[in-house]
Every structure is written in structure tokens, then in C-alpha cells.
């Protein structure tokens, strides 16, 4: 559901205790979220320490152990709603994540200097590794029955060596497969103007939901960011439930449009999957067209929207699985565990919405994550 939506009363009922009893352990919802994020940081830090200790000087081996490890204390929270924390708490969690990313980035840079790893943007790849290590609980929430246990296998395959069969070959590039832009109607086109305003609301709301979570984002917050009041949002879109459903429907329509466009290309499947990853990542991090990521807001969707998400998630899995299988058959993708890799593809960008990107770094992030899926970190 997301930390911001897990009200104290719901948690207390699940634990079989009273709500006042829960208040004896945590001051409020934000305190509970912070403590959960602290535990998650500790689990990631321990896993990273073990991986480096077991593989001194072997960054690829350390990354493999880090991604394949399981938390010792059960499922941890996924740190994906940082903006919902109070400022001091957010700064502390951000600093801890930053230190882990810095350590991974430095180790990646050392591997590049030693010639064991390929050139890459070490900061982006380090963040992607941390995101992939946290992805399994997210998939269990929204994946429509997909096997989250395959994440450790698939993420190791992708991040260590990537999908490409020929690691020396360059990959074909394409125009955006399914361009996503805010419409610019004629000034006298009333229906077009209303549609453009609705689209702009969905873009801004999606970006805020990605960064803050749905529960911590009010309609008033969205309106303030747009310079309009809550009544205008009701007029163009509807209430919060309708807004969340509309953001998710827009995202999945885009995901499926990209996939279908990729399926129709007459090009090696490795290049096609590379292009699709690049486009979806760019849309997720570009504030001008922002799409809500699959796992965000799932707990607040209507039952009809949840069913639609499950169907879309399964359709996306089937489509990308088939493209990867075709790539293996044609020889552009190496033999690999297709199901595990397909399930793991979204994990590479699961961290990205909590970052702030400039126009220059949007393209760099999209390119780096697509390259990571194709070639991994090992030297080419």
C-alpha cells in the first residue's frame, strides 16, 4: 500500500493490538515510516559489508552476492517515499543511502580503472544496484502473480553481464517508440484545451506520487504545484481516487504502447528491448511527461483499477518474455533464464523517481540503465 497509506489503525488490527498500544512504540505515522526506513538501511548496509568482505577486489562478485542475499530479519520496507518524511529524518535516510551509493560508485570506478568493468556512469549504476536489491517486495504488491523470487536471479544476470550475446557490437538506436508529450491545442479548441489541462494535472500528480507517495500527497498539494485550486482538479479529473486511477491508467497505456511499438520493429531483439528500457526510463524521470511507476499507489487503487493493473502487468511480462526469447533464438541475446530476467527488468529503474534530474541527466540516466540491461557491468 505504501508507508503513507498504512494507517495506525490498520497496522494495529493486523498485529492484534490496540491503536493506543501502537502509539506507545511510535510517536506517529512519520516516526513509524522513519524507523522502517532505518531498518531497511541497516539491512542494505549489512548486505553490502558482507559482499565486499567476501569479495575483496572483485566488484562483480560483490554485486552478485549483494543482489542475491536475503534480509536476515524478514521483509524490509522499500525506501521509495522519502519526500513524505520530516526534513531531518529525510536528510538522515538520504545521507545513509548516499554513503552506500558512494561506496558502490567508488568500487565501480576502481573496477573500470583495473579493466575488469566497462566504462559507465558509476553514480547512476550504483543507485540502480541499490534499487534492484530492494525490488522484490514491490513486485509482490502489484505484479499480478509474477514470481518475485526470481528477482535475485534475474537482477544478477542483468547487472553482472547483461543480455547481449555479442558484447563488442554496438546497438542500433531508434526514435522514441511511443512519444509522450503534453498536447498543445489551438487557443480556440476548447475540448483540446481541457484535455491539455487534464494531461498536465496527471503529469504533475504522477511526479508527486512517485516522490512522496500517494497517501502523503493531497489534492491541495497537486493544485499548489499547478497554480490551481482543488475545485479545478475535480473539474478536469475528479477526486483523489479518480486522480490516482487516471495516473496509473495513463502509465500502463504508455508502457503497453512502448512494448507494442517495440514488438513491431524489424530489428534485433536486443536492440528493441534496449530502446524500450530507454524510453520508459526517460518518461519516468522527465518532469515534463512524468509517468507514475507501477508500484506507486497500488494500495489506493479501486478494485477495477487493480484488476486492470494485474492484467496489464501480465501482458507486459508476456510481451517482453516473448521478445527476449526471440532474441535468444536469433542469437542477439545470450542464453539466460528468460523468466527471471523478464521479471527483473523494471528493477533497474525502481530507484529513479526519488532523484532530481536535469534535462541533461534525463537522457544520461535513460541511456545508462538501458546499457546496463544490455551489457551489465563486466568489461566488454
What are these regions (language model features)?
Residues 26, 37, 133, 237, ...:
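DNA major-groove recognition helix of helix-turn-helix
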Residues 1-31, 200, 204, 208-242, ...:
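Helix-turn-helix
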Residues 61-64, 68-91, 105, 284-304, ...:
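Amphipathic alpha-helical segments used for helix-helix packing
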Residues 1, 11, 36-40, 44, ...:
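Generic hydrophobic, amphipathic alpha-helix propensity
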Residues 88-114, 123-127, 134, 304-330, ...:
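Amphipathic alpha-helical packing segments from all-alpha helical-bundle domains
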Residues 35, 46-75, 125, 129, ...:
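Hydrophobic alpha-helical connector segments
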